Amino acid sequence: GSSKKLSFEDIILSGVADDKGLYLPTSTTLENLSYLTQEDLTYEDFVKTIFIALDKNSAKYVEDLSIYPGFESSPTPTLKEVDEKRYVMELFHGPTKSFKDYALQPLGAIADRRLSELGERGLVIVATSGDTGSAAIQAVKNSKNIDIVVLHPHNKVSEYQRRQMTEVIQDNVLNIAIEGSYDDCQNIVKTLLQNNSFNRKVVSLNSINWLRVMGQTAYYVWLTKQFTSPINIAIPSGNFGNAYSAWFGRENGLPINEIFCASNVNDVLTRFI
């Protein structure tokens, strides 16, 4: 695109690019990920290694940082055998029981550290159809340098998801129900990110933030390490962010064959593909 290249420090707090596209790594920004499958690392070190592979300057943000503060136990995913050669990777052991905790917890911690370094207070604006909002809130609710505003479509999230978001009582957390769809919420977020009149750092934790995709790639790195041959992956998909993370890992050397996107009656992605 026509947008300028940004450093790792800039990407932490960035969302939509000036040309309305998304920031992506250049061909020289990220080393091949295949070597990670040969390393004996804890899961948390997997994530840190991926961020450092993205940019060596990230080391000062992650090496001594607890990037899964909301997890009551180890963030290592659980792999359960269903039958011969079929397994389920469980990603619901985080604070909100959503796979999104695995990417948002590190991103929230890293963003808080970056803002502390700058001596600034950031504003996170998130659009959600349910899971992202609660996971984002849990990622930053104890942050010293971040306030968060979550937009969700009124009466279009489950009662469980609504309560996960609206029952967090913190001075730095604000929930807003929007009359409209999730896309309406997302359009508001994109407009605010492009036309920042808040006189402060505005941050997105949606999948438009590249570091969130990297955090999701981490559990595919871990998954491929559990097998001695390439695997196929079927991913429950509301949108393409999670599947894209698997694709990105495959493109950078992870032993993944086919990637299947599975959807329910909410089949917008299926119809799009």
Role assignments for model-derived ranges:
Residues 1-273:
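PLP-dependent amino-acid enzyme catalytic core
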